[in-house]
């Protein structure tokens, strides 16, 4: 019985981005990272990050540094929906503006290479109710309340 319990210990899959694990990604330069990214992200990094993107990275670094050990860092709010998620951003909390409110997003390793805007939906998904009068030809026979 004791042997069975020892075998049930869960092992988690180690994260890799295109065959490179997270520790190696953090040590890479932007030029080496660009080789792993898709064409759109390569083009964006090749053209360079602007001042706003650099200030976001600076604020994220500061929030991570000021956070107590083993706790999540402070949320950093931003309107930069077009910011590409870089490996150094992993573990940060970002408030991404959706046009109305800031949606809190915790950056996970699986998000590397995606845009911040992909994780903050800008519209409210439709919740369809019952069809009204004139919705279809058969709806003429639906009794009114």
UniProtKB/Swiss-Prot annotation:
Subunit note: Component of the small ribosomal subunit.
Gene coding for it: RPS15
UniProt keyword annotations, A-Z: Acetylation, Cytoplasm, Isopeptide bond, Ribonucleoprotein, Ribosomal protein, Ubl conjugation
UniProt-recorded name of the protein: Small ribosomal subunit protein uS19
Species whose genome carries this gene: Bos taurus (Bovine)
Subcellular location field: Cytoplasm
Location in chain, cross-link Glycyl lysine isopeptide (Lys-Gly) (interchain with G-Cter in SUMO2): 108
InterPro entries assigned: Ribosomal_uS19, Ribosomal_uS19_CS, Ribosomal_uS19_euk/arc, Ribosomal_uS19_SF
GO CC annotation: cytosolic small ribosomal subunit
Chief place of localization: cytoplasm
Cited function: Component of the small ribosomal subunit. The ribosome is a large ribonucleoprotein complex responsible for the synthesis of proteins in the cell.
Keyword Nucleotidyltransferase listed: no
């Amino acid at each position: 019985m004791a042997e069975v319990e020892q075998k049930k210990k869960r092992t988690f899959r180690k994260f890799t981005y295109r065959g490179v694990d997270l520790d190696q990604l953090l040590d890479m330069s932007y030029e080496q990272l660009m080789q792993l990214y898709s064409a759109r992200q390569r083009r964006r990094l090749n053209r360079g990050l602007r001042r706003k993107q650099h200030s976001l990275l600076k604020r994220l670094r500061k929030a991570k540094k000021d956070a107590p050990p083993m706790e999540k860092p402070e949320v950093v709010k931003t309107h930069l929906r077009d910011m590409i998620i870089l490996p150094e951003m992993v573990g940060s909390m970002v408030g991404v503006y959706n046009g109305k409110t800031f949606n809190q997003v915790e950056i996970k390793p699986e998000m590397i290479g995606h845009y911040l805007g992909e994780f903050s939906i800008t519209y409210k998904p439709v919740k369809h109710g019952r069809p009204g009068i004139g919705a279809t030809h058969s709806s003429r026979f639906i009794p009114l309340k």
